[in-house]
Amino acid sequence: MSDHHPTGPSAPGTDALSQLGRATTTPQSPEEAVLERVPSPHQGRQYVVRFTAPEFTSLCPVTGQPDFAHIVIDYIPGEWIVESKSLKLFLTSFRNHGAFHEDCSIAIAERLVALLDPQWLRIGAYWYPRGGIPIDVFWQTGEPPKGVWIPAQDVPGYRGRG
């Protein structure tokens, strides 16, 4: 009998993961959400990792009405990369969380920076209009390293029906 793992051998540094490959439930809040990291498979190289969440949702802290955003997160890893299922669950945990657009956007970026200590990270949060005004929030940790190809986020501005 072989030691065949149905999904392949474990990648280095993944033994401590608590969510990947397991049944999970949506965390009730961003504070309850567990973000996990794994060792970067290409330490010493500069490359960009992009996550796009085109259907991000949260709640207005005053009215309780839903807010929607297209979020793009770009980062250049240091020693760590974020485990994507934990990121998905973290982002989904905002679904019932009341906070202003700016707060949600910056909280996401700061939580990732605290977890990963990346060489560089930026977030573009393109919020759909509320009261007729779209709010876009942009933040980054500083200047990106030279010589790294960082594609434009290319999220078109809100055009309504036009």
Curated annotation (Swiss-Prot):
Which residues participate in substrate binding?
V82, E83, S84, H101, E102
Major localization class:
cytoplasm
Q: Which SUPFAM superfamilies match?
A: Tetrahydrobiopterin biosynthesis enzymes-like
Pfam families documented for this protein: QueF (PF14489)
A molecular function annotated in GO for this UniProt entry is: preQ1 synthase activity
Biochemical pathway: tRNA modification; tRNA-queuosine biosynthesis
Q: What is its EC number?
A: 1.7.1.13
> Can you list the GO cellular component terms from the UniProt entry?
cytoplasm
Q: What Gene Ontology terms for biological process does this UniProt record contain?
A: queuosine biosynthetic process; tRNA modification
In this protein, the active site sits at: C60 (thioimide intermediate), D67 (proton donor)
List the subcellular locations. Answer: Cytoplasm
**UniProt KW keywords:** Cytoplasm, NADP, Oxidoreductase, Queuosine biosynthesis
The catalytic activity, as recorded, is:
7-aminomethyl-7-carbaguanine + 2 NADP(+) = 7-cyano-7-deazaguanine + 2 NADPH + 3 H(+)
Q: Where is this region: Disordered?
A: 1-39
Q: Which family does it belong to?
A: Belongs to the GTP cyclohydrolase I family. QueF type 1 subfamily.
| NCBIfam families named among the record's database cross-references | QueF-II
PANTHER family cross-referenced by the UniProt entry: NADPH-DEPENDENT 7-CYANO-7-DEAZAGUANINE REDUCTASE
Query: What does this protein do, in the record's words?
Result: Catalyzes the NADPH-dependent reduction of 7-cyano-7-deazaguanine (preQ0) to 7-aminomethyl-7-deazaguanine (preQ1).
Q: What is this protein called?
A: NADPH-dependent 7-cyano-7-deazaguanine reductase
Source organism per entry reads Gluconobacter oxydans (strain 621H)
User: Gene that codes for this?
Assistant: queF
